[in-house]
Amino acid sequence: MHRAAAVDTTPKIVFYYKCLLNKNWNEPINNIFWGEFFLLQPRLEVLSQLLRECPKQELTVNGPKFHSMYLYISEILKSKAESLRIRNSLATLQTFLAELSVRKPTDVNFTIFLLLGNIDSIDIQFSAFIKNLCQLVKDSEDVQSVEISLRFVLHFVSFLYNSSFISHIYGNYDVFSTLYTVILKRKFGFETAVYAIGLLSACDKFETVNTFRLGLSKIVDEEFFSSVLSSSAQQLISLRDFYVSIKPDNPLTGSFFNLFSLRSSSNNPDSDQESQFSRLPDERATMFFTIYELCCCNKLFLKKLVEGGEKNGEAPLEALLSLLSYINTHQRQSERSHHFSILSLILFHIIIDDRSLLYRLTDKKFKISVRVCSQRYPYPPNATKPATPLGYMLDICCIGIQHNMKLNLSATMYFLYFSFVYRAMTSLVQDGIRMEYHWLELWRVLFSFLDFVSVLINTSPTEDVTRLLELILDVLAYIISNGDALVIRSDELVDLFYKLLHSSKNFSSFSSKIPDERLGALNYLLEVTEYLTSKTVDLPRSTADEVESVIKLELESIPVAKQNAFGGVPPFKESQYRLFHKRASRGMADLLRRKSEAAN
């Protein structure tokens, strides 16, 4: 009994783990050792625990052992007959990366040099490792090996994302060609490759020449685009449905509710639901990054997104717009939501800037059905009614404006929302397009925001508030001057001028707040309101119906703005928002890394 009790039942692989981490264990480590090591069933939980308990000094002393493991893995990746060893070795290496990086997450260089070797040989050895890994993914017929290799690539990308070593990956043609081939052929696990191309394309794109991004810009294969869009749509729908699982959408109503009346509605999310929303969007939003980056660098993909559709289920554009409505509704809940809301607006600007797509965005023959978020008041009217893509994009802007207002001042968000509205209006007028849309609700949002800014400009005047006031006045002046070229029904135009009259009480205080060279829009709005006031001042009771009747009679006589009377559409450059882009991409890389480590 005593002899039996003394038998060591420690699994052999655990014994080897302890040997590797023991600085006094000096037995030779060669390919024979690693060959047996990676045939044994990994005990990754045990390895993680041992790595966490090992002092940093001992890790440093044992660095040559870890580097030997890395070199063996690099070589074995070239052998198609070693599927078991390949799967075990990549899982083990991923655990090493995860646990060592957690020890000092602000400095991945310690982990990199510990595993990958000294500075003299790291470039050559790392390039060989990446090349062999990519070749395995392209050539292997073992489904499990391909899947785990792709997961390792994604983890490696997210692990190296904040270091200078990431350029060794996005600058490596083998990586690009491998991910392209996997997606094109829809190999098992290709969804992981779709995640990876979004992160790699976004990395350092404003600071250096990202050759991975250049490769994406040259793709013309529609099968590749279809694979990306179908995979992305599934993930975007899944994420959207997760929002809905936290809180079902409210019953739909006929119009936007008043901005200030329903902030505390019992149908708004409770504190527990707000907490859950604050953790979204999750790693599935990386698919949005992929769509975003491809739209930025590849016009053919952008065209495919806008014009392409699926006969069964939600089309990719429908899925994308639906998710963005939820993200913009909850964009004040977390920094990640805020960043993705900004990226969604940048994408809207990129789409509207492509004039060849405007017809598709506005033609009623190409209406789509998008599930728009109604989890929080206020929300758009007729959210289930088919509409044009541009109509839904304007709805998302209205959602974001109203949910951002009063609660916090995010000047960047406002500038993007209103500059998009301005850009959309000018595009419609210049192309002579009258779009079917619930214009009355857009007027309501614009004038509600004007009331909001009028309070800010008098109580908390800042440079940002002044710029916002100038922008909203430019937008309103342009719409007032060109309203007949936008709307289809005259009652929509009448309502616009009625709301202008109702808000005119604020105009007199604006003159002293705006520089003289920027007063053109305000002066034009004052001219129009003075004209309409002169026509309605003698009404017996000045009821809404009476005022609207007079406005309807005067539509043809309302003063027209002089050419260049007010500011044009603000110039747009994606690089203006590089900081938000970098924070969003690095945040998603970090989230993917942590998810991968937790799953491992």
Curated annotation (Swiss-Prot):
Protein name: UPF0588 membrane protein C20F10.02c
GO annotation (BP), single: Golgi to plasma membrane transport
TM region(s), chain numbering: 409-429, 437-457
Record membrane topology: Multi-pass membrane protein
SMART domains assigned: DUF1741 (SM01158)
Keyword field contains Thylakoid: no
Subcellular location: Membrane
GO cellular component, one term: cytosol
Record Pfam families: ARMH3_C
Species of provenance: Schizosaccharomyces pombe (strain 972 / ATCC 24843)
Record-stated family: Belongs to the UPF0588 family.
Annotated InterPro entries: ARMD3-like (IPR039868), ARMH3_C (IPR013636)
High-level lineage: Eukaryota, Fungi, Dikarya, Ascomycota, Taphrinomycotina
Keywords: Membrane, Transmembrane, Transmembrane helix
